[in-house]
C-alpha cells in the first residue's frame, strides 16, 4: 500500500467526497489517545514525495524523537485502501483536556465520527463520558477502541473467558451512555455491536488490534493474546502485530462505519448551523456542494514560526482557493485568503484549492479565532448565521499576574502571551492600566499551570507569578425602587430601577439561545415561554452585555432619547464592568429605564454627562437591593477506594464544599461534589494525602453562587484592599448628589 503520494493524487481523492472521512480520537487523559494517533501516523500517514526521500530510512516518529518534540499538527491525513479503493482519512486533533466549560469542544464540530479510546483496566471514566456526550450532541458517530488489553493479561492475569466478560461489560456501559445521550433516531443505529465490527480490541503501544469480523477472517482468538503475553516472549507479541496490525483494524472500521462528509452533513448541518436552514448557504452545506458559496468553520488557530497564523478548519460548502475574499461572521471583518494548503501526514503542502467536505489550512485569516465561521464575501451583509456564537459558558475564574524573570524578556513575554491567547480562547490576557501588570485569567488553577508551562516550553519565557486571585461577580437579591441619575451639569436626568434576572434568563443568555442581535419578537416569545417575562417588556430589551446583564428601555415618547440611546447603552456597559462593592464585574442584573429628561443641545448631553448619570442611578439602586458577591464553584468528580471515602469527604467539607452524589462501583466510590474555586488551590496535595495517593479526580467549572453572608464583608474588604480602594464602602447618597 504505497503511502507516497503527490499533492495531485491526494487532491483527486479529496474531490471524490465518498473517499473522505473526518474523524477524531477522544479519550480520558492517559487512556492512549496520543499513542493511538502516533501509531496511525507511523503506519498510514501520507508521505509526500519530498518527505519520502528522507522518511524512507526514518519513520516520522523517530524523526520526532531526534528533534525531541511531538509534532502537534491540527490535523493528520492518513491513507488506507480497501478492496483496491483508496481513502483519505483526516484525523483531527481534539484537545486532551476537558474543555472545562463542558461546552462542546470546537474540534468535534468538524468531525463526522470519533474513535472513543478506553483503557481496558480503568474502564469508562468521567472524561470519557463528558466527551462522548458532547460528540453525540454534535451528531458525531462513535466507534469504540478498547486499548491496553495487554494489561488484562499482564496485570490482572485474566483468562480468555474473563477478558471477554470484562470487555462485554464495558461495551454495555458505553451503549448505556449512547442510549442516554443520543437523539432518538441514532440511539439504536449507533450502538456498539461487536459482531458488526464497530469496536476494536487491542494495544496501541504494541501495535496489534482486531474487530470480531477481522478476528474471524484471520483466525485470531483471545487465547492467542493471552498466550502471546503469558509466554514472556516478545516475538510472540510482534507476530500478533504482524497478523492483525492495529492501523488496519481501526482504519477499516472508520471507513465502514463513519459516513462520508456529504452523507454526514445532511443530518449534521440542521443540528450545528445556527442560521436559517432554508437559505442558499444552508442548502449548499447540506449537500456539501463544491460549487456553492464558501463556508469554512475554523476549529484551530496555530502560530507557525515561519508562516505566522495558520487557520485550520473544515470547508462545509464551496471550494477554498487562494485570493478569495471572505467575511468573518463573528469578528465582522473582511479578509483575504493568501494561501491554501492541505495536510499530508502532519505536514502542510500547498494546494490550488480544497473542495467541500475536506479539511484545509489557510494563511491570511489573522483576525480569525477558533470557533469562527468564514463565508463568501457576497454574504457580508446578509446576517447568514454561524456555527457558534462567540461566548463560552466557562468564564475565566482565576487570575494571576505575570512578569518576566529577566526584565529584558518583557517584549518576548508580551508576544508569547498574545500568541497563547490566540491558540486558547479560554485564556484571557489583560493589562492592568493602573499598575502596568500583565494579568492572565483562566478556567481554573490547572488551566493556568498548563499555560505557564507552555510559555516556558514553547516560547522560552520564564515568568514570576503572583499568588492566584479568584475572580468574583457582583449581584443583587431584591428589586430596587426607581432612582434619579443626574448628569454633572444637572441638565439630563435618567429614571432607572434594577432587579436580579431569574435563573432561566441567565441560562438562556449563557447558552446562546438569547442574543443581543436577534429579532426582538423572537426574543420576547422565548423569554415569555421559558423565563416568565412579560412579552411587552421583553420586546423592549435593547442591550445584553458579556456578563449577562440586560438593559430594558421602558420609556415612551421621551424627546431626544433616540439620539443619545447609544451613549446611554455605552454608559450601561461601562458601569457593568466594575460594580460599586469591589470593582468586580456585575452579573445577572436587569436595568430598566423608565423615563428621562434629555437636554436639547448636543453639547450638553455627551458621554461626559450621560455616563455618570447612568452609572449613578444604577449604583444607587444596586446598593439598596441586598447587594452580594458571587463566587465561582468547581465541580469535582472523584474516584477513590471505599476505605478512603471518610478522609476525602473530610477534605471537601473543610473546604466549604458539599457532596452532591456518591455511588459505589465494586471497591471504588465515585463522589461528585462542588467546592468554591477560592478553596481549591491546595486541593491536589490534600486529596493525595487523604487517599494515600489513590484518588483520581477531574474538575470543571460548575456555576456562580452567592458568597455566604458570614464571609461577605471580609471578602469585599480583602478585594478592596488589594485594589487600593478606600476602606469605607460607598453609600447610596454618594450616587445621588
Swiss-Prot record:
Compartment list: Cytoplasm
Molecular-function GO term, any one: translation elongation factor activity
Predominant location: cytoplasm
Source species, domain of life: Archaea
Ligand binding (GTP): 27-34, 93-97, 147-150
NCBIfam families the record matches: aEF-2, small_GTP
Entry protein name: Elongation factor 2
Organism: Sulfurisphaera tokodaii (strain DSM 16993 / JCM 10545 / NBRC 100140 / 7)
Gene: fusA
